[in-house]
Regions:
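Long, compositionally biased intrinsically disordered terminal regions
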Residues: 172, 183-188, 199, 203-252
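Short coil/turn segments at secondary-structure boundaries
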Residues: 76-81, 178-179, 227-234
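N-terminal ordered "arm"
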Residues: 2-56
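Short, hydrophobic/amphipathic alpha-helical patches that form generic packing surfaces
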Residues: 17-28, 94-102, 162-166, 212-220
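Internal, well-folded beta-alpha domain core
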Residues: 105-195
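Acidic, Ser/Thr-rich peripheral helices and adjacent loops at domain boundaries
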Residues: 50-58, 190-203
């Protein structure tokens, strides 16, 4: 494959779209200067750029080749990497795949390779953030629906969704990622992800503020003033999460 060219790839922002870009790169024996979702594209740079249509057949060929050539660990790593906020993540993933096709199943252990190191660290950050949201996400009751809003750096919603679906399988709920404009809807046992610029919240249930007040009282009561350590709290409960947490909202 040739060195990086000046051509830029634009795609629809989906994982299948990215895999279609990978197919195009190998088919044309070119390494693009950038791979960007079309909604992030600078319109002044579109001249001379390629818009890569999502081709499910081509995407599936690439998808099947990953575990076959690199192993399931590499497939899982790439799928998680797509949810990260890593700069130029598509190019870093393409670099990883080029290396993986070359060296095979040991690619994930080659941590001295920049492509592997960057993706591994990005996925670790994604997983740490997702883990924090398992404890920090707070629902509020709006009518018969539970609604929570999050503002993550990474696109953690697809990662944390199975946990909350399992935990609240008997409820109807929605989690809205304000950063990535993505909503998870769970109703009557069915799950759906929707892109949404914003959401119009229905009126809160009459009892909601009472529950919030009780939770804040409980949180403040169980704390031991003599053992208070604000630095330790900020370490384990980073301040950027507080504005969405019932017990911390008035402390922001």
């Amino acid at each position: 494959m040739s060195d990086r060219t000046t051509v830029m790839y634009y795609y629809d922002g989906t994982y299948n779209g990215f895999l279609s870009c990978v197919f195009e790169s190998f088919a044309e024996k070119e390494t693009p200067a950038a791979i960007l979702p079309v909604d992030e594209a600078d319109q002044t740079c579109l001249f001379g750029a390629k818009y890569i249509e999502t081709d499910l057949r081509r995407a599936e060929r690439v998808r099947v080749s990953i575990p076959k050539k690199m192993g399931m660990e590499a497939q899982d790593l790439l799928e998680r990497a797509f949810f990260t906020c890593m700069p130029e993540k598509e190019l870093r993933m393409l670099e990883f795949m080029r290396l993986g096709y070359k060296v095979g199943r040991g690619v994930c252990r080659r941590l001295t390779e920049p492509a592997v190191d960057k993706i591994t660290k990005a996925v670790q950050f994604l997983e740490r953030e997702a883990h924090l949201y398992l404890g920090f996400l707070r629902f509020a009751e709006y009518g018969d629906v539970l609604i929570a809003q999050i503002e993550p750096k990474n696109s953690v919603l697809p990662v944390i969704a199975p946990h909350f679906i399992n935990r609240f399988s008997g409820e109807d709920f929605m989690i809205f990622d304000r950063t990535h404009k993505l909503a998870l809807l769970y109703k009557d046992g069915a799950t759906e992800f929707l892109q949404a610029e914003h959401i119009e919240l229905p009126p809160e249930s009459p009892e909601e503020e009472k529950f919030r007040a009780m939770w804040r009282t409980f949180y403040d009561t169980v704390g031991i003033e003599g053992r208070r350590n604000d630095l330790c709290r900020r370490t384990h409960m980073p301040k950027r999460y507080w504005n969405r947490m019932t017990e911390m909202r008035d402390k922001v």
